């Protein structure tokens, strides 16, 4: 099998090349290799569509979901077609792998969250909000920005400066942190429900935080 994130999260929001993804899918099909797509962080509208794979013109054999799936409660999912799931019912039966699987309260929360997402215009508004961030979230100390939908990383000259910026952001009311494999970048991932007014206020606070961090560096 091949396991991929179409948008690598912890490297600092790194989207895969569409042609490469299509070629990967074709190669997997030609070799009868299962393609597993991890959308635990990118799923449920974060990238501008319900799932990121929709923007790449492919359908994975297996889809991994979590985080936003539960609407605030712990919930994960392994999604595949009937044939694929049927292969997991014997030799051996995989029903023993979870104690709390299918928790009814978490599943109800996930279902309710999905209904709210589908009934709102949040996903349709992401392109406008993404463009606003690209136009307004600019500062000389930001060396690079990588983004996909309402999801962005800001790169600074060092991990020390990035962590100072993150700390100043938190002090100014903006929750952020750095990335597991990119400590010189900070994460911009506001809730999909954020209004343009709130987004504008957040951008201003981030700029102020950068100024404060640079001054103390």
Annotate each language-model stretch with its function:
Residues 1-217:
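Conserved N-terminal phosphate-binding loop of PLP-dependent enzymes in the Aspartate aminotransferase
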């Amino acid at each position: 099998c091949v396991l991929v994130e179409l948008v690598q999260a912890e490297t600092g929001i790194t989207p895969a090349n569409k042609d490469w993804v299509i070629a990967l899918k074709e190669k997997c099909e030609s070799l009868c290799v299962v393609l597993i797509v991890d959308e635990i962080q990118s799923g449920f509208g974060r990238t501008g569509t319900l799932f990121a794979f929709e923007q790449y013109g492919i359908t994975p054999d297996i889809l991994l979901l979590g985080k936003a799936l539960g609407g605030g409660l712990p919930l994960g999912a392994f999604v595949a077609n009937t044939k694929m799931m049927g292969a997991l019912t014997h030799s051996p039966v995989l029903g023993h792998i979870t104690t709390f699987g299918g928790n009814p309260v978490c599943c109800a929360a996930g279902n309710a969250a999905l209904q709210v997402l589908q009934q709102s215009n949040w996903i349709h508004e992401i392109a406008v909000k993404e463009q606003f961030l690209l136009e307004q979230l600019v500062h000389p100390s930001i060396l690079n920005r990588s983004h996909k939908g309402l999801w962005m990383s800001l790169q600074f000259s060092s991990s020390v400066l990035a962590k100072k910026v993150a700390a100043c952001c938190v002090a100014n009311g903006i929750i952020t942190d750095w990335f597991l494999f990119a400590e010189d970048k900070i994460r911009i991932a506001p809730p999909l429900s954020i209004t343009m007014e709130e987004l504008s206020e957040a951008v201003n606070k981030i700029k102020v935080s950068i100024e404060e961090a640079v001054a103390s560096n």
